[in-house]
Structure formats: C-alpha cells, structure tokens
C-alpha cells in the first residue's frame, strides 16, 4: 500500500498489485485506480482467499499483461513478495514456487518488448523460510534466463 500511495497521483508510473483482499491494511480494492492526474495509472487485482495458480494466470493474462502492453513502460520494477505462496503462514493464497517463475517470465517478456529488458526486482514479503528460499531462487534463475528453473 505504501508504493501505491507514493505513485497514485503520478500518471508516468503504472502501478499494479496482486494481493489478498480484504486483508490488512484494507487497501487495494479494484476501485482504487489512482488520484487526480494519476487516475487510471493504478491497477489493483485483489484476490480472494484460496486464489491459486489458475486464478493468477487468468488475472495476469486478461488484466495485467494487456494493461502493461498499453502503458509501454521504460522499466519494470517488481516488488517481489512471496507471501502468496501456498506454504506461507500469514496469507490465504495458494501459489506454487513454479508459478512465481511463470509470472517473472511474463514480465520479462514485457520488458524485452518495451524497455530493452530493463527490469529490477526488490524483495518484499514471504514468511515461510523454505518456501521463500525456493521462490526467490526460482525468481532469480528466471531473471538470469536460466533454462532449469526450479
């Protein structure tokens, strides 16, 4: 929610978030699309408890990727939170390690098309240390274009 609020009035930054909703702190509904000049530059994709790989694939394919294609970013910044992993004790989302690699690959393809592959990832959440380690490794291997993603 801090990143969303930082850029919600800036039309030069397209902010996208997938997250469990409702969940603390209660922000991130579909209706939050930006403020003022930034209206329309925020895409929240709230997920119900129990959302899984199929749910995320659908949202990525039907909402996120088309929106990113329209925006044509100069760089893609990933706030890589792994607390949606099925083993994470704090959330209710059921993503697998492999699906993090799938999402990373889709974003890399967008970066290749629109910003000469410029992509930056920073680590955010993830509270099951084994799942976090595997997911981060999978994400980094994908970013490095390794063929043998976990």
Write out the residue ranges for each language-model feature:
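A general "terminal functional-core" signal
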Residues: 1-150
């Amino acid at each position: 929610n801090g990143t969303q609020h930082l850029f919600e009035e800036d039309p030069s930054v397209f902010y996208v978030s997938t997250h469990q909703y409702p969940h603390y702190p209660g922000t991130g509904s579909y209706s939050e699309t930006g403020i003022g000049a930034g209206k329309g530059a925020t895409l929240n994709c709230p997920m119900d408890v129990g959302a899984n790989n199929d749910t995320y694939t659908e949202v990525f394919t039907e909402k996120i990727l088309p929106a990113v294609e329209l925006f044509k970013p100069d760089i893609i910044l990933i706030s890589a939170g792994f607390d949606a992993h099925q083993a994470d004790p704090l959330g209710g989302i059921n993503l697998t390690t492999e699906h993090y690699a799938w999402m990373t690959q889709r974003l890399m393809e967008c970066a290749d098309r629109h910003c000469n592959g410029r992509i930056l990832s920073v680590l955010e959440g993830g509270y099951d240390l084994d799942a976090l380690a595997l997911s981060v490794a999978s994400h980094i291997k994908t970013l490095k274009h390794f063929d043998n993603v976990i």
